Amino acid sequence: MSAGSPAEPRPVPGSVHSVSVSIPDVRSVIGFESGDPATLRRIAWGYPRFRTHPYVARVAALVAGAVGGRAQDLVLTRSVRAAEAAAAYAGLAPGAVFEASGVRGVRVAEDDPALAAVRGHVQHTGAHLTSREAEDVLLEAGLIEARQAEEAVSEEPAEAVRSALATAYGAGDPADVSLHNSGMNAVAAAVAAVTDLQRPAGRRRWIQLGWIFFDTMSLLDKRLFGTDHVTVPDPFDLAALSRVVAAHPGQLAGIIAELPSNPSLRCPDVPALREIADRAGCALVLDATIATPHNVDVLGYADVVCESLTKYATGSADVLMGAAVVGSASPWAAQLREGLRRFGDVPYHRDAARVAARIRDYGDRMKRVNAGAVALAGFLERQSAVRAVSWPYDAASQANYRKVERLSDAPGGLLMVDLRVPLERVYDRLAVAKGPSFGAEFTMASPQIFIAHFDLLSTPEGRAELRSRGLHRDMLRISVGVEDPELIAEVFRDAFDGAG
C-alpha cells in the first residue's frame, strides 16, 4: 500500500504539510488522546485544527517578543476577523487581538480560563494559521532555507478551484462557490450567514439532524453564534423532525445535516428535508464532503452545501481548505453569498494553489475510490469478526442515497465497521496509514470513536451515550483509496486472519 503503517508514529503522507499522523496501535491512540507525555513525545504531529503545526509553533515564538507575550500565550489565526471573533466569544477586550510581522491572533495568558474558549473557537470555526502561510513567514525571517517543493497552480488558483467545483456541483455560476480556510470554516460561515439573515425575523433556533461531526455539533452546543438548537437523534426519523418543526413555529433558522453523517454514515432523505425546511421557512445546510459532488446531486435541494476540500477533492492529505456552494434557487442566495464572505476566511493563496493542482483529478479519483469501496464492503461483510458495515449502500441508507445519486456504484470511500472483536485485534495488525482524517488517495483506517469522542469513552455515562447513538469503542472507520481493490482486500485479509 502506498502509505502503509510504520512501526512508529509519523506524519502521513510525509509532507511537511501533512494533515494526518499514522498511529500504529490502539495503546498509542489512547496515550495520544489522553495526553500521556511519553506518547506525545513520540507523536509530534496531528490534524492541524486539533494540534498546532510545528511551523505555526515556530511563528508564535517568532512574534511573541513583538507583541509582549510568550509563544504559549498566542493563538494565531488566518485573519483579523477570526481573531476578533474568537476574542469576543471568550469575553476578552479588543486589545487581546494583535497583528505583528504579518501575523494575526489573540494574546491570552496560558493560565487564563479564556484561553480554552479562544482555542475552541478557532478550532471549531477552522480559522487557524495554516502551515504554508507559516512556512512563508519563517522563510521571510530566514529561519528556514526553502519552501517544500510541490505541484501547484500559480495562475489564478482560486478561480480554477471555483470553476471545477461549480462544474461538479452543477452550479450556474462560479460566483456561487466561496472558498474557505478549511472545511469547518465553510460550515461555520454557512451557519453564521444563515443565522445572521434569519435573526431579524426572530429565528434563532437550529435543528441538528443526527449525530454529526464533532466540530459541527460544537458550533451549536457551545453557541458560537448565539443560537439555540434542537437535536433530532435519528436522521431517518422524519416524523420526529416534523414534530420538532411544528413545536417551534416561526423560530427556526435552519436545519443542518450531513450526507452521509460522520461517523455513523447514515444518509437522510434529502428531498424530504427540503420539503420540511420549506414548510418551516428555514434554510437547509448540507455537508456532502463524504459523498462528494461527483457522486450525489444535492445542490438543488440545499440553500448551502459545504465541503472539506482537504478530503477527496485533493486526495493528497497535505492541505486544509473548504468550500461552500450556494443553491441558486435559494430565496436567500444573494444574502448567503455575501454572508459567506463576511463570516468566513479566504484561504491562503498557496493553499489554493495546491488544491487547484490536485482538484483536476477529482472526478477520476472518485471513480477509483468508489470501485474500491464497493469491493471492500463486500469483503468485510463476509468476515466473522465483523458485525456490520455502515455505508451509503447498507439497508438503512440505500433508498435515501439512491434518491440523490448521480450514477450507480458511487458510494464514496468511507466505511464504518462494527467489530465483534476488540479493536486492537484488527487495528494493530493493519498495514495501512492509521489516524485522523479521510479522503486521501491512499487507504486509511481510523479508530474514529477514540479520536472524535475520547471524552465520552472515558466514562460509563459517556459510553452509554455513545451506545445510544449506535457507537462504541470497537468500531473501525476505513477511508478507501485508489489502490487496486484486490490489493486493498489482501491487506485487510491479513489483518482479519486470526482476529477471531
Curated annotation (Swiss-Prot):
The modification N6-(pyridoxal phosphate)lysine is found at K311. It is an enzyme of class 4 (lyase). Keywords: Amino-acid biosynthesis, Antibiotic biosynthesis, Lyase, Plasmid, Pyridoxal phosphate. It comes from Streptantibioticus cattleyicolor (strain ATCC 35852 / DSM 46488 / JCM 4925 / NBRC 14057 / NRRL 8057) (Streptomyces cattleya). Involved in the biosynthesis of terminal alkyne-containing amino acids such as L-propargylglycine (Pra) and L-beta-ethynylserine, that are produced as antibiotics by S.cattleya. Catalyzes gamma-elimination of chloride from 4-chloro-allyl-L-glycine (also named L-2-amino-4-chloropent-4-enoate), followed by an isomerization, to form the terminal-alkyne product L-propargylglycine. Pfam families: Cys_Met_Meta_PP (PF01053). It comes from the Bacteria. Disruption phenotype: Cells lacking this gene no longer produce detectable amounts of L-propargylglycine and L-beta-ethynylserine, that are terminal alkyne-containing amino acids produced by wild-type S.cattleya. They accumulate the intermediate 4-chloro-allyl-L-glycine. Pathway: Amino-acid metabolism; Antibiotic biosynthesis. GO terms for biological process: antibiotic biosynthetic process; L-beta-ethynylserine biosynthetic process; L-propargylglycine biosynthetic process; transsulfuration. The keyword Lyase applies. Belongs to the trans-sulfuration enzymes family. The keyword Lyase applies. GO terms for molecular function: cystathionine gamma-synthase activity; L-propargylglycine synthase activity; pyridoxal phosphate binding. The gene is besB. PANTHER family: CYSTATHIONINE GAMMA-SYNTHASE-RELATED, PTHR42699. Its cofactor is pyridoxal 5'-phosphate. This is L-2-amino-4-chloropent-4-enoate dechlorinase/desaturase. It catalyses: L-2-amino-4-chloropent-4-enoate = L-propargylglycine + chloride + H(+). Its EC number is 4.5.1.-. SUPFAM superfamilies: PLP-dependent transferases (SSF53383). Gene3D superfamilies: Aspartate Aminotransferase, domain 1, Type I PLP-dependent aspartate aminotransferase-like (Major domain).
